[in-house]
From Swiss-Prot:
Residues 1-23, 224-274 are annotated as: Disordered. The gene is rpl2-A. The keyword Plastid applies. GO terms for cellular component: chloroplast; large ribosomal subunit. Keywords: Chloroplast, Plastid, Ribonucleoprotein, Ribosomal protein. Belongs to the universal ribosomal protein uL2 family. Part of the 50S ribosomal subunit. Its main location: plastid. It is found in: Plastid, Chloroplast. GO terms for molecular function: rRNA binding; structural constituent of ribosome; transferase activity. PROSITE patterns: RIBOSOMAL_L2. This is Large ribosomal subunit protein uL2cz/uL2cy. The lineage of its organism: Eukaryota, Viridiplantae, Streptophyta, Embryophyta, Tracheophyta. It comes from the Eukaryota.
Length: 274
């Protein structure tokens, strides 16, 4: 969608750049409420995920990541805003009467038809197993475990590429730059996720950030020593350590945090780029 700029009447409108208006009128049988009580806290009430809290109340839209309406054509009826993700969603009316939401593929418009199955056309928005796709196909919403539903390349503008097929596995290049193996029987959706220009948005003011449920970020070096290992000192002082650390004393900023000997290590052919 296009980026909309406001007339510069106030500082917030001068610096803001938002998506052109996309309406949201979700179906009642495809939404349910969410109960956010933690705000980044664990069961003991201790902050484990910082800078979270507040935000506007949201209704969760049930998204069909499995695409298990096989060989039944559906038509895109609406393109809607979803407050729970930066990608847009589409309402699909299938010929058997089923109605579901899916991620909006880039370039899809109202009235387009989609289908999922084993022998379907290689067309934007169609879902099929990797074994039926030609090499070089751009895909998103990729399954890792057969039948579990898409888990990879679901953010706005995300796209992966099928680069090889050998034996029981297919080789994919993911949006992060990682190259990994996935079962050829897993399904994916053809095309790229829509709302590619999401990184061009500028909220323009702090209040818009708070609506998203994000609180201010404070640097550890300006805290007191009791609050952060980087804190303390007279005036503007260095951190006083060999390397930066988290508030709990673990290495930060560059230290690899992936678990050693993880089960999926043998499936990753090339580590993601930084």
């Amino acid at each position: 969608m296009a980026i909309h700029l406001y007339k510069t009447s106030t500082p917030s409108t001068r610096n803001g750049a938002v998506d052109s208006k996309v309406k949201s009128n979700p179906r009642n049988n495809l939404i349910y409420g969410q109960h956010h009580c933690g705000k980044g806290r664990n069961a003991r009430g201790i902050i484990t995920a910082g800078h979270r809290g507040g935000g506007h109340k949201r209704l969760y839209r049930k998204i069909d990541f499995r695409r298990n309406e096989k060989d039944i054509y559906g038509r895109i009826v609406t393109i809607e805003y979803d407050p729970n993700r930066n990608a847009y969603i589409c309402l699909i009316h299938y010929r058997d009467g089923e109605k579901r939401y899916i991620l909006h593929p880039r370039g899809a418009i109202i009235g387009d038809t989609i289908v999922s199955g084993t022998e379907v056309p290689i067309k934007m928005g169609n879902a099929l197993p990797l074994t039926d796709m030609p090499l070089g196909t751009a895909i998103h919403n990729i399954e890792i475990t057969l039948g579990k539903g898409g888990q990879l390349a679901r953010a706005a503008g995300a796209v992966a590429k099928l680069i090889a097929k050998e034996g029981k596995s297919a080789t994919l290049k993911l949006p992060s730059g990682e190259v990994r193996l996935i079962s050829k029987n897993c399904s994916a959706t053809v095309g790229q996720v829509g709302n590619v220009g999401v990184n061009q948005k500028s909220l323009g003011r702090a209040g818009s950030k708070r609506w998203l449920g994000k609180r201010p970020v404070v640097r550890g070096v300006v805290m007191n020593p009791v609050d952060h290992p980087h804190g303390g000192g007279e005036g503007r002082a260095p951190i006083g350590r060999k390397q930066p650390t988290t508030p709990w004393g673990y290495p930060a900023l560059g230290k690899r945090s992936r678990k050693r000997n993880k089960y999926s290590d043998n499936l990753i052919l090339r580590r993601r780029s930084k």
